Each structure stands twice: as C-alpha cells, then as structure tokens.
Amino acid sequence: YKVDAEQDQVEFDHKLIQFEQFHYLMLHKPQGVVSATKDHHDQTVLDLIHEDYRKGIFPVGRLDKDTEGLLLITDDGMLAHELLSPRKHVDKVYFAKVSGQFGENEIARFKEGLDIGNGERSKQARLQILKADVQESEVLITIMEGKFHQVKRMEKAVGSEVLYLKRLSMGSLKLDEELKLGEYR
C-alpha cells in the first residue's frame, strides 16, 4: 500500500504511528560525559539516551568532558550545519566561573577578538560580567564560532582560568531549566 502522509493514518497494534522526518533532543549534558557517539574509555552523551532513540542521531557540536549544559542531539545534518557553521553567526552563550577579577579591560579584549594560540584568533565575542571578586568572577560569554576548547583558550589569553563552564544557549534554542543534569526532552 502507498501511504499519503498528509491524509492517511497508520496504526500498528491499535497504536497510531506518526511520521517523523527528523528527531531532536535537548540534553542537559553533565560533566564527565564526552560529546561523541562512541568512545572506548568514557561514557558518551548517546549512552544517556534511551536506546529506542539512538539510531542515526549525533551531538550537534561538542562540549568538553568537564563542561555541562545545552547539547542538541539530532539526525538532522542540515540543522547541525546551520548551527555550527561560523559563516552563519549563531550565538552560543556560556556561563563561566573564572579565576581573577574581570573588568572593562577584559570586556574590551573579548570584543576585539583574542589570540588563542596555535596561530588562531577568536572572532569578536561578548563578555558580560555578572560578579567580580578578587579571586573569582562570574561571566556570560557569547561566541559565534566553536574552535577547540575556545572559551578556555580565550580565558587563558586574558590571564584567567575557567573553573566551571556551562552552555546556556545556541541561537534561539535555550537550555530548559527544568531539565536536570543527564536528562533530555
């Protein structure tokens, strides 16, 4: 039989079968888990997903093993490209606790772009200071690219170290605050 997805309903064992072209899962990635589909040594983000949903899905981008927060998992390659391509200028917002006291100097340096080592320079980024103490500051960092360990390398470039890092959003997609670490929807 030929099914018209617009008009026909298909049931199996008295349950309605819905056509889904792509699957999208929002994961609150915990620390200690790697952003990969397979790993021989560490638990992966796909290990957190029920096996019924795992076929063909992959994480959109990567979060370091010690970073937590928003990770989109999908089988939609076009969407992944739209979110990750530096040419698309999609904002990625992170909350960070960093060593040292941040001020106007760091804001200006982030705005200019930073030499992050290995002959690479970050694009302009936004730095918003939430709390600044002598020992530690809390900041929001907005970047439009995703170079390897980029936020950590940017912090190092201004003489600081990341103590805690969490991705809050990618473009208009924001981490659901109701999701506990390791949960997805």
Tell me the role of every PLM-derived stretch.
Residues 1-185:
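Basic, flexible Lys/Arg- and Gly-enriched helix-loop patches that mediate nucleic-acid binding at interfaces
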